[in-house]
Swiss-Prot record:
Protein family: Belongs to the RNA methyltransferase RlmH family.
Reaction(s) the record says it catalyses: pseudouridine(1915) in 23S rRNA + S-adenosyl-L-methionine = N(3)-methylpseudouridine(1915) in 23S rRNA + S-adenosyl-L-homocysteine + H(+)
Subcellular location: Cytoplasm
Disulfide bridge partners, by residue number: none
Organism: Pseudomonas savastanoi pv. phaseolicola (strain 1448A / Race 6)
Gene responsible for this protein: rlmH
Functional description taken from the UniProt entry: Specifically methylates the pseudouridine at position 1915 (m3Psi1915) in 23S rRNA.
Xref: Gene3D superfamilies: 3.40.1280.10
Protein name: Ribosomal RNA large subunit methyltransferase H
Length: 155
């Protein structure tokens, strides 16, 4: 099974890349953690933001193969504790499909992406910076795996 983070935005600071890669390499091979970056359209003063969101959503969905699970990260999604995330991770693992965790751009996800979502997850009611979200997702996936495997990291 693969866990794939599909996120709008690229050219992250080095600390973000290092943080993401640190948690990705800690994951066992049977739960590979991957990152797919979707280029962010340049927002100018008179930008057609709705068109940009739609284009970014199309690019995100183009990375998803038929039958794969889509989980959107949304402020109004369901908040999961670490233990609840571990339960979800175990369900995903038993389902054996690739899980695509979708993170939109500054204005959020395209409605088409949300419509395809099987689950909606909220990391926090706070607005979080996109670079930090990547590391947070990586760390939480690793932490959930340690709960399932009895690894002492979570304690």
């Amino acid at each position: 099974m693969r866990l794939r983070l599909i996120a709008v935005g690229s050219r992250m600071p080095k600390w973000v890349e290092e943080g993401w890669h640190e948690y990705a390499k800690r994951m066992p091979s049977e739960l590979a953690l991957e990152l797919v970056e979707i280029p962010l359209n340049t927002r100018g003063k008179n930008a057609d933001v709705a068109r940009f969101i739609r284009q970014e959503g199309e690019a995100m969905l183009a990375k998803v193969q038929p039958g794969e699970r889509i989980v959107t990260l949304e402020v109004h999604g369901k908040p999961w504790s670490t233990e609840q995330l571990a339960v979800e991770l175990d369900r995903w693992r038993l389902d054996a499909r690739t899980v695509n965790l979708m993170v939109g751009g500054p204005e959020g996800l395209a409605p088409e992406v949300c419509a395809r979502s099987e689950q909606r997850w909220s990391l926090s009611p706070l607005t979080l910076p996109h670079p930090l979200v990547r590391i947070l997702i990586g760390e939480q996936m690793y932490r959930a795996w340690t709960v399932l495997s009895g690894h002492p990291y979570h304690k």
